[in-house]
Swiss-Prot record:
UniProt main location, coarse: membrane
SUPFAM superfamilies named in the record: DEATH domain (SSF47986), TNF receptor-like (SSF57586)
Expression across tissues: Detected in embryonic dorsal root ganglion and retina.
GO biological process, one term: apoptotic process
Topology Extracellular: residue spans: 29-239
Signal peptide: 1-19
Name under which the protein is recorded: Tumor necrosis factor receptor superfamily member 16
Membrane topology designation: Single-pass type I membrane protein
Gene Ontology terms, MF aspect: coreceptor activity; death receptor activity; nerve growth factor binding; neurotrophin binding
Residue ranges the record marks as coiled coil: none
Length: 416
């Protein structure tokens, strides 16, 4: 028995046993009898096994991939999505890129190419969308739905249902929606059930006569005799809000235009008053005639010649005689205007304030070529435009020199 065991060992074959071969998944062996190693997912074979063991290397992201465990397969190149194909999943080490047809196209299973999605015509709506390898599936719009556009994305839409305060002017069809409009000028209210009545009956009421009146009521309340609960029927007054806003805007614009027109008209009248007055009028060579309140005309040049040579032009402060400023000769009025305008400070503005003018009207004079002339032209048209008033105003603004110039040559009395 002891000699039988060595004999049995000699009869066993050399190399790997049958049990070890059954455990070799690749079913490939090296020359030395070793089971060949397989490359995992994301790896490719660089050198297959033979004398040596299998050599693997990782695949390059977005360039190559390997989606199998193999002892012979190298990394495979990634698929490129071109033309009408777009990439839905990128290429990684263990998976290839996934391409699909672009929006509006589907992939034909027979040819593998992308074809344009079918369109549901008017009156037909989408049942199943167009995507991947499936074309658009359309259905005819059933009753109560419609489709008024031809496309491959919209299903049949439900028809519009008119409200209680609306009336249908066009019925809904498979190709067009229903059309409704408000009940006008009548509306219908329903009375609640009263004792002894079978069912409420609609009561049609005429609207109140609102000619010449603007109403802001949004609800119309009707009460029923024998019932303390009012029945409220919504009207169409909510739609009047844009109308009210438009009216308010028109009123504001009109008010602004009216104010602008009044200011423009005031400035225009002042300008016309200044232009109507003669500017360059000089006395005639024969002498200038002055008219006093007594109606006697005196030659001012002759009176000047008759004055004694030693009489001084300076004297007591001049006093007004109650005559109007408009009675002054044009040359004297022009002299006053020049004195008011030649001052370094705006003397004419101070004078205007003393004569009772407000700032807005004074600003109108500044737009004229000669503000002082426009001021005096406007003031001289008033009944209170006397020399006395002008003298008082000039003294208040410390311009007695202009007051003296008014009477230097303008007043003269004739001997009686």
């Amino acid at each position: 028995m002891a000699g039988f065991v060595p004999l049995l060992l000699l009869l066993l074959p050399a190399g790997p046993t049958w049990g070890s071969k059954e455990k070799c998944l690749t079913k490939m062996y090296t020359t030395s009898g070793e089971c060949c190693k397989a490359c995992n997912l994301g790896e490719g074979v660089v050198q297959p096994c033979g004398v040596n063991q299998t050599v693997c290397e990782p695949c390059l992201d977005s360039v190559t991939y390997s989606d199998t465990v193999s002892a012979t397969e190298p990394c495979k190149p990634c698929t490129q999505c071109v033309g009408l194909h777009s990439m839905s999943a990128p290429c990684v080490e263990s998976d290839d890129a996934v391409c699909r047809c672009a929006y509006g196209y589907f992939q034909d299973e027979l040819s593998g190419s992308c074809k344009e999605c079918s369109i549901c015509e008017v009156g037909f709506g989408l049942m199943f969308p167009c995507r991947d390898s499936q074309d658009t599936v359309c259905e005819e719009c059933p009753e109560g739905t419609f489709s008024d556009e031809a496309n491959f994305v919209d299903p049949c839409l439900p028809c519009t249902i008119c409200e209680e305060n609306e009336v249908m002017v066009k019925e809904c069809t498979a190709t067009s929606d229903a059309e409704c409009r408000d009940l006008h000028p009548r509306w219908t209210t329903h009375t609640p059930s009263l004792a002894g009545s079978d069912s409420p009956e609609p009561i049609t009421r005429d609207p109140f006569n609102t000619e010449g009146m603007a109403t802001t009521l949004a609800d119309i309340v009707t009460t029923v005799m024998g019932s303390s609960q009012p029945v409220v029927s919504r009207g169409t007054a909510d739609n009047l809000i844009p109308v009210y806003c438009s009216i308010l805007a028109a009123v504001v614009v009109g008010l602004v235009a009216y104010i602008a027109f009044k200011r423009w008209n005031s400035c225009k009248q002042n300008k016309q008053g200044a232009n109507n007055r003669p500017v360059n009028q000089t006395p005639s060579p024969e002498g200038e005639k002055l008219h006093s309140d007594s109606g006697i005309s005196v030659d001012s040049q002759s009176l000047h010649d008759q004055q004694p040579p030693n009489q001084s032009t300076q004297g007591p402060a001049p006093k007004g005689d109650g005559s109007l400023y408009a009675s002054l000769p044009p040359s004297k009025q022009e002299e006053v205007e020049k004195l008011l305008s030649s001052s370094a400070e705006e003397t004419w503005r101070q004078l205007a304030g003393e004569l009772g003018y407000k700032e807005d009207l004074i600003d109108c004079f500044t737009r004229e070529e000669s503000p002082a002339r426009a001021l005096l032209a406007d003031w001289s048209a008033k009944e209170t435009a006397t020399l006395d008033a002008l003298l008082v105003a000039l003294r208040k603004i410390q311009r007695g020199d202009i007051a003296e110039s008014l009477y230097s040559e303008s007043t003269a009395t004739s001997p009686v």
